[in-house]
């Protein structure tokens, strides 16, 4: 009788552990899904439109800014979550901005040192990451209220979602406007990355509509339409 009770207790404990483990896995998956698709900062929240539309003229520029944004998001979420209990609620926003500005400055200096051509190309949009609503929004809505690991994962997921949206829009505009993709990628990853550059079609003149700001709005509209269509089909 005692053995049977012990077995039942052990089985119950295993079930509880399994349920907790599954719940943890579902949390990680949900955070990732929110950043990549369900609550994508670019095509759902429509945040950070200024750099999204201005820098996405080529896939390389878009990818560079996307990676910088992802790095800043991950780092700021990490720091804010780590010190969330010590940050006074009354002055939390200025403190968040200081943390974000410090991180952006570090990223800017790194890009200036190692990817100077891309740094010149992105120009003012690197320091403008400080004012990006995505970063301050995730700091306030998630990092200040959740555990360190979940906050790191949220920052990475949201940053990756933004980087993917930027790169897809940049690739679309570059292909239609210039007939190339990842032109100048060696400025970001070095000479060994030149194999990523492809000439889709050869043209003597560029399709200026897609290179200029109107093309950014058209491309973003197409991305929004495709996402909404996929969501409607899933329903």
UniProtKB/Swiss-Prot annotation:
UniProt entry keywords in alphabetical sequence: Cell inner membrane, Cell membrane, Electron transport, Membrane, Translocase, Transmembrane, Transmembrane helix, Transport
Cell location: Cell inner membrane
Keyword Translocase tagged: yes
Membrane topology per record: Multi-pass membrane protein
Chief place of localization: membrane
TM spans (from-to): 63-83, 93-113, 117-137, 152-172, 206-226
Region forming the signal peptide: none
EC number: 7.-.-.-
Taxonomy, superkingdom: Bacteria
Top class in the EC scheme: translocase
BP GO terms, sorted: electron transport chain
InterPro entries: NqrDE/RnfAE, RnfE
GO cellular component: plasma membrane
Protein task: Part of a membrane-bound complex that couples electron transfer with translocation of ions across the membrane.
Subunit-level organization: The complex is composed of six subunits: RnfA, RnfB, RnfC, RnfD, RnfE and RnfG.
Family affiliation: Belongs to the NqrDE/RnfAE family.
Protein name: Ion-translocating oxidoreductase complex subunit E
Species assigned in the record: Haemophilus influenzae (strain 86-028NP)
